[in-house]
């Protein structure tokens, strides 16, 4: 049989795909979080304008959101507590969609947040895959459980 039709082990292929999606999602959150951390007054001003929130509170909230975006991006990138980090990212992305709406007349950029929500949902359902710290931890716990049974 030709190598063209030979299928590699699907577990490794799936984990490689999950890793690629984790990297993309993580860098999206690094980009967004670093912007908020480096200039919290900028995002805070937008929050103030859109919600009427106190300017100081809006700036502080922008900083907190930015730090958590950086942390969740780091966790998703290394595959540690991937599911909770992805759930947090879904909440942030839904918040962004609720603030800015879905104006499909603005071109293909509007699909970014729904696409990222899809990636985050996939991570919630599948975890980090074989190429994440979660996998190594679960493998270690499974070995401990098996040794306790014996």
PLM features: what roles do these ranges have?
Residues 44-57:
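Perimembrane loop-to-helix junctions flanking transmembrane segments
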Residues 1-38, 56-67, 71, 78-150:
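Extended, low-polarity transmembrane helix blocks
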Residues 38-39, 43-44:
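Core FKBP-type peptidyl-prolyl cis-trans isomerase
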């Amino acid at each position: 049989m030709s190598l063209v039709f030979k299928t590699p082990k699907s577990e490794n292929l799936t984990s490689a795909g999950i890793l690629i999606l984790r990297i993309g999602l993580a860098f999206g959150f690094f980009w967004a979080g670093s912007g908020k951390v480096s200039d919290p007054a900028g995002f805070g001003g937008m929050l103030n304008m859109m919600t009427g929130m106190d300017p100081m509170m809006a700036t502080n909230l922008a900083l907190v959101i930015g730090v958590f975006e950086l942390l969740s991006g780091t966790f998703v990138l290394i595959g540690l507590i991937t599911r909770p980090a992805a759930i947090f990212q879904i909440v942030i992305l839904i918040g962004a969609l609720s603030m800015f709406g879905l104006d499909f007349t603005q071109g293909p950029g509007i699909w970014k947040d729904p696409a990222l929500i899809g990636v985050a949902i996939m991570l919630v359902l599948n975890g980090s895959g074989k190429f994440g710290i979660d996998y190594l931890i679960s493998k270690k716990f499974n070995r401990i459980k098996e040794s306790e049974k014996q």
